[in-house]
């Protein structure tokens, strides 16, 4: 029986396809613990994303405005590689990185055409968590 030859190793995972999208949406989800920035094309397919944890912050440093700034810059840079120029910004959540993330999207070179707050407001839904005693 002939010896088995090994085939070349194959990479698993998706192949990155360079899209040429000029306009899209930027979704900034800013919670008390983290900030996540997703940039999509007009149909909603994600082109680039970044978060405070993805950029390299851990623990309580993820919730800082500086971490949100770096995450937004990182996502904007990736989106501009795909040809993105203009974005509509949708902000969700009560976190501290909201305004900083919007400013850093503009500073990175993306033209912000509109900003809207899409934070969900309950009509007296779930009971909120108990007050912290420090």
UniProtKB/Swiss-Prot annotation:
Which protein, by its recorded name, is this? Answer: Small ribosomal subunit protein uS11
Instruction: Fetch the Pfam families from UniProt.
Output: Ribosomal_S11
Keywords linked to the UniProt accession: Ribonucleoprotein, Ribosomal protein, RNA-binding, rRNA-binding
Q: Which organism is it from?
A: Corynebacterium diphtheriae (strain ATCC 700971 / NCTC 13129 / Biotype gravis)
Checking HAMAP family in the record gives: Ribosomal_uS11
Query: What domain of life does the native source organism fall in?
Result: Bacteria
Say which family it is in: Belongs to the universal ribosomal protein uS11 family.
One molecular function GO term is: structural constituent of ribosome
Its biological purpose: Located on the platform of the 30S subunit, it bridges several disparate RNA helices of the 16S rRNA. Forms part of the Shine-Dalgarno cleft in the 70S ribosome.
Quaternary data: Part of the 30S ribosomal subunit. Interacts with proteins S7 and S18. Binds to IF-3.
Q: Which PANTHER family match?
A: 40S RIBOSOMAL PROTEIN S14/30S RIBOSOMAL PROTEIN S11
**Gene Ontology biological-process annotations:** translation
Which InterPro entries does UniProt cross-reference here? Ribosomal_uS11, Ribosomal_uS11_bac-type, Ribosomal_uS11_CS, Ribosomal_uS11_sf
Which Gene Ontology cellular-component terms appear in the entry?
Answer: ribonucleoprotein complex; ribosome
């Amino acid at each position: 029986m002939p010896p088995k030859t090994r085939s070349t190793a194959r990479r698993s995972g998706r192949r990155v396809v360079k899209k040429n999208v000029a306009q899209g949406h930027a979704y900034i989800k800013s919670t008390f613990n983290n900030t996540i920035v997703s940039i999509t094309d007009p149909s909603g397919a994600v082109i680039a994303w970044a978060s405070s944890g993805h950029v390299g912050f851990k623990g309580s440093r993820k919730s800082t405005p500086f971490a949100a700034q770096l995450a937004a810059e990182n996502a904007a840079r990736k989106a501009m590689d795909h040809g993105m120029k203009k974005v509509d910004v949708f902000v969700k959540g009560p976190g501290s990185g909201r305004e900083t993330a919007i400013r850093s999207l503009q500073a990175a070179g993306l033209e912000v055409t509109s900003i809207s707050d899409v934070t969900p407001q309950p009509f007296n839904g779930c009971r909120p968590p108990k007050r912290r005693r420090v």
